[in-house]
């Protein structure tokens, strides 16, 4: 029996490793190829699956045993990527440099996330029939949607793509997704992944946890379900391909951030989070997260909704490190000192306040006065009551793709403050000509614009000139004005990451 060959990138990450372990269960159906960086840690971990006992016997570039192949290389090296892609029927591509690492090295994030994805596309194009026999699953991010605090926390595919200010990770994922959608590949999908709840939760203790507003609505997925869903793409039907999806664990995995903090801090032995953290340590806006209104669409294909929020907490409880027990007996005063050191680091909100970092204060709080006005825990202001509302996409979404016409595209362009310059609409994949409100002309398929929420690449961040864009683009303004004033006028430069190094 001839097996399909599957390339998996990012096998050392949370989603990727879960996918790797799931693929191992299906070796009767698939040969496995990994593209893995040749670090000592990776070599020790992955070579045991090759049956190699001594690291000294490992080939420097490629090892292959019984249908399991490891290409030791890097996404940013086109030759390494081609060696991995060559001969594969499927490419599962979750590899990425994520935050907070991406915040500190946005140039490397762009190389890995964007240029690396372009290398994957190019390698597929070099295959037989220009890659028409190879299917690509690209993993995007909920971060592409940007700041979606209530009442706009209900997210759908097709909503505006607006990365939060300073979120360099999101900007690279957006650029990479655009490249995938417009690649011309016959078989592709983009899966916008939500927050992955990992068992080793203490490893997430980082200043970035304070960037998240307490009222943020979030819908997580466990690492096992994320990896399982990724591998399930291998069995997806023809109608699955050529689309964009939101991936999460479903409604049973929804929560509000302050609730998650309460449960997680208790679970980790830290007790009442209000005793170890001050309320004004947390930002008021400018992160990402929401509840996916349409994640059921992907689950209908992949059937990956297997775990709920309680299952996640059970996994965390099972993986608690020894020092989580020690925390229980340490006076909470010392725990608070430890956490305050975190929030006072260069990427921490209190450091921005004390150093008068105008850009960060403006982006994450609105103003220093608004930070000063944050009440104590005694005042209940972190809850949101109400269902929120869905965003308008600028055209009749009740129409099937086959029912859309040129006037629908022109209507959508007008709602974005621009124009559709083309006078002929062929299909959802064929690129058309558009113009944005600032006069930039560009090409993009209806799938990219109407179904993906993308718009003008010249206006894409970085830099972030959102106040001017929102003034001319009603589609964009739906998100931006939900927690920004229409009198704001601020510009955030592309090099603004340097003030947190």
Question: Language-model segments: what does each one mean?
Answer:
Residues 61-115:
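NAD(P)H-binding glycine-rich loop region in Rossmannoid oxidoreductase-like domains
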Residues 76, 104, 108-119, 163, ...:
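Glycine-rich NAD(P)-binding loop of the Rossmann-fold in SDR/ketoreductase-type enzymes
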Residues 97, 118-166, 189:
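Conserved Rossmann-fold NAD(P)-dependent oxidoreductase catalytic core, especially the SDR/UDP-sugar
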Residues 111, 144-188, 211-215:
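Catalytic helix-loop patch of NAD(P)-dependent Rossmann-fold dehydrogenases
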Residues 211-235, 242-243:
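Substrate-positioning beta->alpha
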Residues 229-296, 300-389:
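Mid/C-terminal beta-alpha module of Rossmann-like enzyme folds, strongest
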Residues 373-501:
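Functional cation/ligand-contacting sites centered on basic and imidazole/sulfhydryl donors
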């Amino acid at each position: 029996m001839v097996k399909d060959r599957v390339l998996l990138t990012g096998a050392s990450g949370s989603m990727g490793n879960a996918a790797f372990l799931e693929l191992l269960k299906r070796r009767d159906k698939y040969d496995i190829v990994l593209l893995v960086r040749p670090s000592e840690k990776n070599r020790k971990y992955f070579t045991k699956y090759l049956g190699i006992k001594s690291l000294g016997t490992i080939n420097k570039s490629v090892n292959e045993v019984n249908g399991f192949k490891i290409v030791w290389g890097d996404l940013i090296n086109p030759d390494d990527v081609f060696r991995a892609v060559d001969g594969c029927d499927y490419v599962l591509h979750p590899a990425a440099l994520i935050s907070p690492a991406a915040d500190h090295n946005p140039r490397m994030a762009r190389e890995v996330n964007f240029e690396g994805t372009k290398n994957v596309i190019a390698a597929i194009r070099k295959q037989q029939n220009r890659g028409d026999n190879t299917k690509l699953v690209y993993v995007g991010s909920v971060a592409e949607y940007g700041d979606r605090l209530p009442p706009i926390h209900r997210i759908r595919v097709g909503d505006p793509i607006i990365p939060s200010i300073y979120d360099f990770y999101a900007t690279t994922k957006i650029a990479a997704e655009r490249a995938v959608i417009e690649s011309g590949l016959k078989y592709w999908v983009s899966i916008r992944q939500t927050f992955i709840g990992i068992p080793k939760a203490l490893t997430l203790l980082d200043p970035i946890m304070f960037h998240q507003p307490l009222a943020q609505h979030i819908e997580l997925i466990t690492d096992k379900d994320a990896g399982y869903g990724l591998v399930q793409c291998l069995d997806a039907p023809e109608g699955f391909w050529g689309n964009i999806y939101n991936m999460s664990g479903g409604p049973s995995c929804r929560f509000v951030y302050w609730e998650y903090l309460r449960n997680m801090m208790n679970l980790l032995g830290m007790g009442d989070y209000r005793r170890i953290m001050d309320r004004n340590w947390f930002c008021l806006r400018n992160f990402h997260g929401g509840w996916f209104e349409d994640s059921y669409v992907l689950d209908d294909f992949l059937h990956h909704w297997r775990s709920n929020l309680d299952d996640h907490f059970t996994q965390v409880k099972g993986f608690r490190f020894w020092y989580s027990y020690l925390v229980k007996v340490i006076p909470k005063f010392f725990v608070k000192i430890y956490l305050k050191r975190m929030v006072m680091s260069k990427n921490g909100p209190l450091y921005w306040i004390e150093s008068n970092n105008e850009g960060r204060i403006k982006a994450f709080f609105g103003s220093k006065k608004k930070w000063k006005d944050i009440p104590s825990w005694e005042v209940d202001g972190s809850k949101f009551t109400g269902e929120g509302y869905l965003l308008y996409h600028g055209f009749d979404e009740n129409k099937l793709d086959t029912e859309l016409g040129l006037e629908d595209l022109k209507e959508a362009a007008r709602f974005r403050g621009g124009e559709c310059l083309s006078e002929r609409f062929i299909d959802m994949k064929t690129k058309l000509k558009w113009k944005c409100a600032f006069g930039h002309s560009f090409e993009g398929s209806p799938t990219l614009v109407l179904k993906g929420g993308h718009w003008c690449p010249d206006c894409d961040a970085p830099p972030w000139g959102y106040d001017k864009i929102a003034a001319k683009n009603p589609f964009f303004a739906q998100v931006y004005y939900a927690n920004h004033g229409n009198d704001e006028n601020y510009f955030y430069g592309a090099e603004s990451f340097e003030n947190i190094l």
